[in-house]
Amino acid sequence: MEAVQAAAAATSSGGSSGSVPGSGSGSASKLIKTEPIDFEMLHLEENERQQDIEREPSSSNSNSNSNSLTPQRYTHVQVQTVPPRQPTGLTTPGGTQKVILTPRVEYVQQRATSSTGGGMKHVYSQQQGTAASRSAPPETTALLTTTSGTPQIIITRTLPSNQHLSRRHSASPSALHHYQQQQPQRQQSPPPLHHQQQQQQQHVRVIRDGRLYDEATVVVAARRHSVSPPPLHHHSRSAPVSPVIARRGGAAAYMDQQYQQRQTPPLAPPPPPPPPPPPPPPPQQQQQQYISTGVPPPTAAARKFVVSTSTRHVNVIASNHFQQQQQQHQAQQHQQQHQQHQQHQQHVIASVSSSSSSSAIGSGGSSSSHIFRTPVVSSSSSSNMHHQQQQQQQQSSLGNSVMRPPPPPPPPKVKHASSSSSGNSSSSNTNNSSSSSNGEEPSSSIPDLEFDGTTVLCRVCGDKASGFHYGVHSCEGCKGFFRRSIQQKIQYRPCTKNQQCSILRINRNRCQYCRLKKCIAVGMSRDAVRFGRVPKREKARILAAMQQSTQNRGQQRALATELDDQPRLLAAVLRAHLETCEFTKEKVSAMRQRARDCPSYSMPTLLACPLNPAPELQSEQEFSQRFAHVIRGVIDFAGMIPGFQLLTQDDKFTLLKAGLFDALFVRLICMFDSSINSIICLNGQVMRRDAIQNGANARFLVDSTFNFAERMNSMNLTDAEIGLFCAIVLITPDRPGLRNLELIEKMYSRLKGCLQYIVAQNRPDQPEFLAKLLETMPDLRTLSTLHTEKLVVFRTEHKELLRQQMWSMEDGNNSDGQQNKSPSGSWADAMDVEAAKSPLGSVSSTESADLDYGSPSSSQPQGVSLPSPPQQQPSALASSAPLLAATLSGGCPLRNRANSGSSGDSGAAEMDIVGSHAHLTQNGLTITPIVRHQQQQQQQQQIGILNNAHSRNLNGGHAMCQQQQQHPQLHHHLTAGAARYRKLDSPTDSGIESGNEKNECKAVSSGGSSSCSSPRSSVDDALDCSDAAANHNQVVQHPQLSVVSVSPVRSPQPSTSSHLKRQIVEDMPVLKRVLQAPPLYDTNSLMDEAYKPHKKFRALRHREFETAEADASSSTSGSNSLSAGSPRQSPVPNSVATPPPSAASAAAGNPAQSQLHMHLTRSSPKASMASSHSVLAKSLMAEPRMTPEQMKRSDIIQNYLKRENSTAASSTTNGVGNRSPSSSSTPPPSAVQNQQRWGSSSVITTTCQQRQQSVSPHSNGSSSSSSSSSSSSSSSSSTSSNCSSSSASSCQYFQSPHSTSNGTSAPASSSSGSNSATPLLELQVDIADSAQPLNLSKKSPTPPPSKLHALVAAANAVQRYPTLSADVTVTASNGGPPSAAASPAPSSSPPASVGSPNPGLSAAVHKVMLEA
């Protein structure tokens, strides 16, 4: 009884992985035999065994004992040295391949058959097993064959596609009698199968009970070693082990018994298998579906044709065997050894032959799938007898080598154990699910199959196809015709009937020209010849396709009658609508009445309305739950439309995906109440239109939706009309990707006819009503597209923001102690930062602008009563919901590479900024520093930098202050600082030069810009103007607050600044559309995030943090702790002085100033609200792309700037200068006072001491902190000597000469530098063509000479006059070329010597004081 115990062990080990049918049974459970790869030896052994068995048939058990190697769990690894069949990992260096024989224990589940008699040992050899079964009474034989616990040995080799698998056939259960009869034939190996198209296959031999059950090549891709795509032809490289010769009458009785038992019950459904793991591979499923659906089981004739598809061959041996076992069990009762001899032969072949056949057998039992090795492919159909005859004839003609029973699919590899093992063990039910588990519709891969009932038809003439020939299913006649035509290269006489003869079975010989033409047209090709059997999975596909076509024909007939019956169709659609829609007239009228009588207003953040793309975090779940039900209603409604269920899964998905929101809008349109200008949310609350958040381009969307709703509601559609209109919106034949267009068009036309009927009935006096209604469909689609985009953007942003929050918490904790920033400040920063990544960023600057935390509520907590532009009012909530606000504002934590990775220390950070300027200036970006008073700057930043085209900045400041307390962790990046560059939001930021950049900005209220123009840019423009006004007001009310107005760089005419931006986007429809498209993610920040854990970045951040800490400690009251603390502030130069109110107002009035300039000049991190949007701008700012020369120059300038800034800062308040530039401390008020004298031209005076450490360019983002610290200390010392220089130095950033900002920074302030003992080099640049639009594209033309000269002059001056200061004035007269005069001047000569241009001058004078 060892065998029984072994079998039990196998069962336990197999678990529920499925019972593998075996030819041993409980009474004769067999032990595993590993089949030697040398099959010749195996034949000899088996011969001997067979003789022994014949001598003592009854004692087969004991015989098997002698052969038994090990119980089931044993795994034998045998290495066969064979010429390398394929250069895969299995091939050893010596050219041999390791063939691993493993019992398939995973998939083996012992079927506990109570009827099993004594425990028969696992019989090793086929002969033993067969002999045992032969000698055993039929019952025993059945048990033998049904034993599921027999272990399998799977030999898997990866073979080249064109390698013949020369194998000597060991007797296989299917060919045993043949083995006896024709040993000589068996000794010769059958002609190898050439799988020439398959490049990598795994040759799998499944040995169960010592018999080679299956020898098949499976696509390697399906297996663990899979390398190549699935073959286009049969996977099994060779037929099951022994060539199956036409077994007309001589099959041994035991063979018959076994196969009878296996497959006789023609339609008996297999008993449910032991709990199978995941569903089995599709081939089984489809066949089984085919059988289980009541179609007669595939019979031999039915089996004739199999479509060869390139799907992976999933091995399903176990399930097939299991099914076979079950069938055998059922069959046991009606079996007699020789009765069903013929059927058995066929069935046997089928059952052992292919996974598809076996699955079909499993399901239907009696389908015989004879698969010939020649291209004749058998597919199962119900015409058994005909096919049997055909096959037998072919078999006899083909002879033994040509035909062999397709093997059961090789068992799945362990990799797929979960799914395929279940398939192996699973019964037909599981099989049914299996093909679907692969996710492919059976018919989808066989679009060209034509069926007549269950018969595949020839694609050329419509006759009964005999197989898959030359790439298509064709009959023998057309196959031969095509073969003759191509082999003999026959040139047929051209057709005399216009070459349009219809080729039918009855007339196919009349016109050979047209017949050949049609052969080629349907896809016949000499190259499509396949060798070997049709892959089993394809066979299964064909069966499924047949079955489906049969079903579909019946269903379509029923559907045709239903669609043609208009009243019935009307009733069905109306019923579906009423059952699935919660917003019928009655229900909604009650809700509207209640809303008017006692409105319960919903705050936008808590909005539960389909149009709100961004419900606040806590309400998002509730919103989703409430709204999911509505969406489900639409899906259910679609499913109830007659004919929808007949569509393929792909078509259903396509229609629903494209039309879901359209139908949803039609249903929800009644929730918009234009009388009270509000929307009734799904939770019954009312939300006013002006309260809906304007973020994420939502204002444009909301306005459009309200307009559309008003238009639709004015039509007063009835429920029947709404239901039919929803159906038409869903079932639209013009959706791309539809397959069954014919049916969809038919449904559409019928539904449209129903709608026309209803409309004519309800509105006899409005004949044009239907046309008017259908005209709304394009608008409806546009709305749903916009809405979907916003939702997608919101989701992405949301995830991004959450992620940012999570990792910002660590940093935030660090920075918390140092920064007592007000929460709003940090929050604004967060938004700012968020803007960089926000996909919305460039899309909907409008909304972001609206969302900008411009709401006074957020700004005033600072106590600054700043008039916020009207646009910002609606978004007051945004700041209160920082996360939401950040999300909607299109912000994304702007962790610029410069800030995060590369700004390890202040030196690096500033190098980043200035260096990137050098890079940017070449690309036409302008960096306009505005010098501000420190206090002003901080306050203004708290107020937010309004003029950033996103008023977000305005609120950014205040919001920053509040929110920094709330979200200090966010603040860490965000406030990182003033250095955060914001990409320009202007239309130019897309890299597209519209040519319409005008200097006038129409003042437009936030609500007014909801035309189809790019909401974002138009609002930006409006915001710029309004921001300018607001800044001006702020400056007036709070002279201490100087607002840095940074607007997209447009021609800066200070006088026209308020009118600058409005028209820009309005005139560019294409640009509007471009800007509405969701932008790409900010790749820099994404990379940053990816590399954040990297130790290099950690170290840099750590260093940053330390410097920031030191700076914070040294910072004085003059500089806000805001500017001092954040480690991320490092990129910001020490002192960015805010210009005096006059300067600020000029700047504010000048929307033309680049936002970039604002970022650069903005000293306190609070201002970092305006984070960059466009990936293009960001990439332009990415410093690593600078050339070494640029880096060197930027380094020099940066060091100078740092030193000078720190000097300026320290001059006013001791210790400020000591702060490393990373602290981005704003210069003391005195500096600002000096700066108040600056004219419209921005002047950068950098005074650095001789001992400035390194001019050598620090590698990107990693300038040594020591250099920065030394520079700061040196600058502090120099600053102490030179208090007034602070104003001059306050402008840290190198102003790109073509910065168009006309900030009123009077060069007079440069006199501050006069005190410093260090020699100064003053570079004054007048930019003539300040009106030139900013072009961010990397291929932008080089800056005009005036700007170029400024850059070059600055850099060259530094290099040329290392010890000497010079006034280099590059003045670009508006008309003429710039005159650059470099005159060495004593350092004492005040820079003021360069007369400050009047603020009104259009030429911006950039004065760069470079210390030698």
Swiss-Prot record:
Keywords: Developmental protein, DNA-binding, Metal-binding, Nucleus, Receptor, Transcription, Transcription regulation, Zinc, Zinc-finger
Residue spans of biased composition, Gly residues class: 15-25
Induction: The expression of this protein is developmentally regulated and is correlated with the 20-OH-ecdysone induced activity of puff 75B.
Cysteine pairs bridged by disulfides in the record: none
Positions with biased composition (Polar residues): 69-81, 124-133, 151-164, 1206-1219, 1231-1253
SUPFAM superfamilies cross-referenced by the UniProt entry: Glucocorticoid receptor-like (DNA-binding domain), Nuclear receptor ligand-binding domain
Residue spans of biased composition, Basic and acidic residues class: 32-57
Region (Disordered): 1-96, 110-204, 258-298, 321-448, 837-878, 984-1021, 1044-1064, 1108-1174, 1204-1317, 1368-1401
Pfam families: Hormone_recep (PF00104), zf-C4 (PF00105)
InterPro entries in UniProt: NHR-like_dom_sf, Nucl_hrmn_rcpt_lig-bd, Nuclear_hormone_rcpt_NR1, Nuclear_hrmn_rcpt, ThyrH_rcpt, Znf_hrmn_rcpt, Znf_NHR/GATA
Stretches assigned to the NR LBD domain: 565-813
Mapped zinc finger ranges (NR C4-type): 458-478, 495-514
PROSITE patterns: NR_LBD, NUCLEAR_REC_DBD_1, NUCLEAR_REC_DBD_2
Residue ranges: DNA binding: 455-531
A biological process from GO: intracellular receptor signaling pathway
GO annotations of cellular component type: nucleus
Cellular compartments annotated: Nucleus
SMART domains tied to this protein: HOLI, ZnF_C4
Family recorded in the similarity comment: Belongs to the nuclear hormone receptor family. NR1 subfamily.
Function field: Implicated in the regulation of ecdysone-triggered gene hierarchies. Probably plays a key role in mediating the regulation of the larval molt by 20-OH-ecdysone.
UniProt protein name: Ecdysone-induced protein 75B, isoform B
Source species: Drosophila melanogaster (Fruit fly)
